[in-house]
């Protein structure tokens, strides 16, 4: 099961800030936010275009639920939406010159580098926060920017910070394939920067060498290995009561259960994760289904989490909120958000979730039920 409990997020901070502030003037209390997303598709659209469009639509639907809920907390918002699939380069340039664009507090999108470059090369107004919501993009350094999905360096840096807090007494082993890769180099560099000592372990031919330390508290941290390698790693720590395997950043894309492995000892780092329904995700899912007549994808949850975070910060801190992002980690429905400054006016999200899963064998449960019926 997911071992992470949802802590009190920045909502408490927002409430305290709102109580301590005088009412803003009407023209300064409005969050003006624009969305540039590829939503529209028709019969001539390719399958990949349709998939991207559906993801963007789900994201935007999650955004609308977040904004609706934030309005009950007192948020005043003006929303401007431009559909990228109905625009060409010349109309994108026209958008940057429009009155609506010139007064934005936040711009969300596009989600491709080509459109981003077109807009960036024609910017006249730069006093806003430009957000890349679904992938790492090169945003211009002439504006304040936030990438919600960071590259390996920042993801690994965030993961190191989380592991350091949660497992302060454990010995660290970096498990790598025999053939070194770029991710291994990033791990080594970030571990050195953090001043963390570690033992290097090689995974090859379904074996790891050398063996982990004798200590009971050991972390086997994977860099560039495959999901199946956890079997040989688990054998090395099975008798250590407080040792864990930390999967590679890609493991959660293809989680598989291996009979000989106790999944409660495997940690899957992930930026976002849907695992079951607690009361908060269940409430969101119901509201999404009622409004969209479909189950929410992960993109709907991402849209909700991101805009909930932005809106709460705007409520608490005003128009220049992005210069004062809180240092604490915000736990959303499926995303942990930890904003880290990359440069003077560029930020990235380094929040990670440490997921531990528990697989339930349904067939065994059914057999037990049948046995009870036979007895009766």
Report residues per predicted region.
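Extracytosolic ligand-binding ectodomains
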Residues: 2-5, 23-376
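N-terminal signal peptide c-region/cleavage motif recognized by signal peptidases
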Residues: 17-21
């Amino acid at each position: 099961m997911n071992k992470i409990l949802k802590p009190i997020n920045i909502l408490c901070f927002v409430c305290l800030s709102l109580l301590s502030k005088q009412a803003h003037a009407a023209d300064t209390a409005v969050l003006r936010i624009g969305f540039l997303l590829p939503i529209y598709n028709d019969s001539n659209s390719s399958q990949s275009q349709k998939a991207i469009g559906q993801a963007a639509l789900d994201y935007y639907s999650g955004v609308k639920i977040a904004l609706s809920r934030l309005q009950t907390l007192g948020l005043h918002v003006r929303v401007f939406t431009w559909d990228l699939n109905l625009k060409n380069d010349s109309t994108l340039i026209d958008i940057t010159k429009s009155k609506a664009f010139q007064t934005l507090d936040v711009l969300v999108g596009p989600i491709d580098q080509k459109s981003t470059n077109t807009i960036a090369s024609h910017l006249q107004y730069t006093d806003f926060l430009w957000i890349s919501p679904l992938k790492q993009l090169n945003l211009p350094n002439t504006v304040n920017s936030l990438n919600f999905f960071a590259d390996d360096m920042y993801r690994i840096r965030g993961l190191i910070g989380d592991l350091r807090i949660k497992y302060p007494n454990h010995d660290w082993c970096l498990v790598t394939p025999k053939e070194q890769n770029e991710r291994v180099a990033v791990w080594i560099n970030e571990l050195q920067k953090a001043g963390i000592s570690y033992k290097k372990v090689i995974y090859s031919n379904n074996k790891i060498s050398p063996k982990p330390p004798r200590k009971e508290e050991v972390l086997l941290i994977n860099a560039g290995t495959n999901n199946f390698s956890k079997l040989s790693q688990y054998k090395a720590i099975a008798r250590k009561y407080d040792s864990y395997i930390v999967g590679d950043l890609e493991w959660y894309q293809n989680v598989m259960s291996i009979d000989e492995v106790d999944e409660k000892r495997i940690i899957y780092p992930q930026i976002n994760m849907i695992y079951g329904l607690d009361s908060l995700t269940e409430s969101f899912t119901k509201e999404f289904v009622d409004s969209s007549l479909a189950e929410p994808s992960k993109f709907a949850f991402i849209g909700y989490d991101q805009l909930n975070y932005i809106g709460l910060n705007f409520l608490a801190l005003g128009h220049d909120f992005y210069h004062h992002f809180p240092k604490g980690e915000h736990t959303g429905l499926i995303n942990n958000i930890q904003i880290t400054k990359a440069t003077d006016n560029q930020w990235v999200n380094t929040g990670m979730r440490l997921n531990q899963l528990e697989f339930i064998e349904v067939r065994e449960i059914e057999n037990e039920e049948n046995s009870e019926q036979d007895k009766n």
